Amino acid sequence: MNQLVVKLVKLTFKSPVHFGMKRLSDSNHTIAADTLFSALIIEALQQQLELSHLLNNLVITDLFPYNKTSYFLPKPLIRIEGKKGDESGYKAFKKLTYIPVENYSEYLRGEIDSLEASKIAESLNLGKASLSTKVSLQAVDHNGESEPYSVGNFTFYPESGLYFLAKGNADTIGQLEILMHALQYSGIGGKRSAGYGQFRCTIEDSGKFDSLLSQTGNIAILLSSAMASDEELVDCLEDARYLLKKRTGFVQSKTYADQLVKKKDFYAFSAGSTFYQKFNGKIFDVSDNGRHSVYRYAKAFWLEGKI
């Protein structure tokens, strides 16, 4: 039962989502692996399940978009040589944030031209962002009236949604399946009490990803928001191209403290960052004088490529 398998977990959303950014009125349409992992841990605790499979064996990617039959992966941070003086070509590549799985190897080889890059960007039409006005029952203005506020949300089109890849042994994947089916109803992301973030979940074989995931190459592309341990950090940074993003948020546990408390700020390499030296990453403790540990998932899920 120790053989590792990779599964594709597909989320089709039944309601708008609120994936928080800096302001409540903002909302993203994707989420990082650590947000999903926190939701899995909370659900496992509520069901009184053993956490060892999640903590020790599970490796997941960030959640990436799909549209119809196309699954997208983050654009790797590599230099693509365009035609000299072709400014429109430069802009077309700059607009790209994701690359379809079927075009990923071509992109790494520099075989996608600016026209195809523009078509890829246009194909990433996933849904619509909007603002919803809510009324706070707690906050009131100087006239004693309830204070309105705006919530950013994103509604996926029927044939679009998010997916992630999960790696683990059979027992770990079995527990993941139990937890994901429970999360369908409680939802994922912010404003779940208002019905946001509910989805239908299917778990499939990794299929069209297999050839990409099995290839070897001279560069490693990060598919999860991750951070190296102190022991790994120096070696992995040599010649790496990466973006760092700040990860923060509030502790959701009701037993951690008597009031709402923020987690320690944490910085992670963004998905799409490229390295010549792989690292494993780990799950970090970001608690800050609370009653128990608070986990921040930062394990690395890799895709190798040739450039």
UniProtKB/Swiss-Prot annotation:
Keywords assigned: Antiviral defense, RNA-binding
InterPro entries in the cross-refs: Csm4, Csm4_C, RAMP_III_fam
One record GO biological process: defense response to virus
Superkingdom of the organism of origin: Bacteria
Name of a matching Pfam family: RAMPs
Keyword RNA-binding among UniProt keywords: yes
Entry keyword Oxidoreductase: no
Molecular function terms from GO: RNA binding
Subunit structure: Part of the Csm effector complex that includes Cas10, Csm2, Csm3, Csm4 and Csm5.
Function statement: CRISPR (clustered regularly interspaced short palindromic repeat) is an adaptive immune system that provides protection against mobile genetic elements (viruses, transposable elements and conjugative plasmids). CRISPR clusters contain spacers, sequences complementary to antecedent mobile elements, and target invading nucleic acids. CRISPR clusters are transcribed and processed into CRISPR RNA (crRNA).
Family the UniProt entry places it in: Belongs to the CRISPR-associated Csm4 family.
Further information: Encoded in a type III-A CRISPR locus.
Protein name (database record): CRISPR system Cms protein Csm4
Organism annotation: Enterococcus italicus (strain DSM 15952 / CCUG 50447 / LMG 22039 / TP 1.5)
Name of the encoding gene: csm4
